[in-house]
Regions:
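Catalytic cores of nucleotide-sugar-dependent glycosyltransferases that transfer UDP/GDP/TDP-activated
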Residues: 1-133
Length: 133
């Protein structure tokens, strides 16, 4: 069973898109999968362990893919998730201006925050994403 869409939620799962795109890029199971990342107005102050990039480098062959997380702030690890995703969903009404600008620069599909009609909005967004090959 190959997933059509892998939906990642929040900063805790933000390295998953990088690993799927780089470490598992030859894995037939994930080759055609679309990655969607949901962003929320929650996170942490400061930085994660400064060895994070070193640990990720150990797994990945292309070190240029980890430059964003060399300073592992909340914003930077989310930028890494965005860079390695096919689409973004605003899971909160407020997303930082820096992340909003970064997403806009990438020109990727975005589902803005929805407080109602979630099911219909998500299904339509997924359908559009899958049909945009």
């Amino acid at each position: 069973w190959a997933p059509d869409i892998i939906h990642v939620h929040g900063w805790m799962a933000s390295l998953l898109p990088l690993y799927l795109r780089e470490f598992y890029k030859e894995e037939p199971l994930f080759k055609e999968s679309k990655i969607v990342t949901s962003l929320y107005n929650s996170g942490f102050e400061g930085e994660l362990n400064s060895d994070l990039a070193v640990k990720v480098k150990f797994d990945l062959s292309e070190n240029d893919k980890i430059s964003t997380i060399e300073t592992p702030t909340h914003t930077n690890i989310l930028k890494s998730a965005i860079e390695n995703s096919d689409a973004i969903i605003h899971g909160s009404e407020i997303i930082s201006e820096e992340l909003s600008s970064f997403i806009e620069e990438k020109g990727m599909p975005v589902l803005e925050y929805e407080s109602e009609n979630l099911k219909e909005s998500y299904l339509n967004f997924y359908a559009d994403l899958l049909s945009a090959n």
